[in-house]
A protein has these predicted regions:
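Short solvent-exposed beta->alpha transition segments
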Residues: 39-40, 54-105
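Sterically constrained small-residue positions within well-ordered secondary structures
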Residues: 6, 12, 89, 103-105, ...
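A general boundary/transition motif marking the beginning of the first structured unit of a protein
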Residues: 1, 33, 45-46, 67-70
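Short, low-complexity N-terminal intrinsically disordered segments enriched in polar/charged residues
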Residues: 27-51
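Solvent-exposed, well-ordered amphipathic alpha-helical segments
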Residues: 7, 44-48, 60-61, 107-110, ...
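Sec-dependent bacterial lipoprotein signal peptides
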Residues: 1-28
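Exposed beta-sheet edge and beta->alpha loop/turn motif
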Residues: 95-140
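Short, intrinsically disordered, low-complexity terminal segments
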Residues: 9-16, 35, 39, 98
């Protein structure tokens, strides 16, 4: 090979390397899918409920202002009663699954479609509306 061909090959390899690096940078700097993040947040909040972490479930609900402690306690009791009702009617919720999620980033909202798998082998698809506030997804 002569020097001209080596120069052309070297330039071609440099160009391929530069394009590869640019693609890598673009792929690494992309933001996570908002619908996917909202879906994972919804699942986590409902998993807290299944684990008996009622306070964490209630804290996952969006409220623009703080609430009195007595009202928070009522919400926690409501969550416990809901789980008791599910236990009586379906032998409890055993698992939650994400089916789909759609996000409207302009409005900072998402709809997460989940399936509740009950202890009596039945399932129920549930729509979980979510809202984003300061980069965190909350149950609406």
């Amino acid at each position: 090979m002569d020097l001209i061909h080596l120069g052309i090959i070297r330039k071609a390899l440099c160009a391929v390397l530069i394009v590869s690096c640019q693609l890598l940078i673009v792929n690494c700097s992309t933001r996570p899918d908002p619908a996917g993040v909202a879906a994972q947040a919804a699942k986590q909040y409902y998993d807290y409920l299944l684990e008996g972490k009622y306070e964490a479930f209630i804290d996952g609900q969006y409220r623009p202002d703080s609430i009195p402690g007595s009202y928070r306690e009522q919400l926690i009791m409501n969550a416990k009663m809901f789980m008791g009702q599910q236990q009586r009617e379906h032998r409890g919720i055993k698992e939650t699954r994400i089916v789909n999620a759609e996000a409207d980033t302009a409005r900072h909202e998402a709809n997460v479609f989940m399936v509740f798998c009950y202890g009596d082998s039945t399932t129920e698809e549930v729509l979980v509306p979510m809202v984003e506030n300061k980069g965190i997804w909350y149950l609406r």
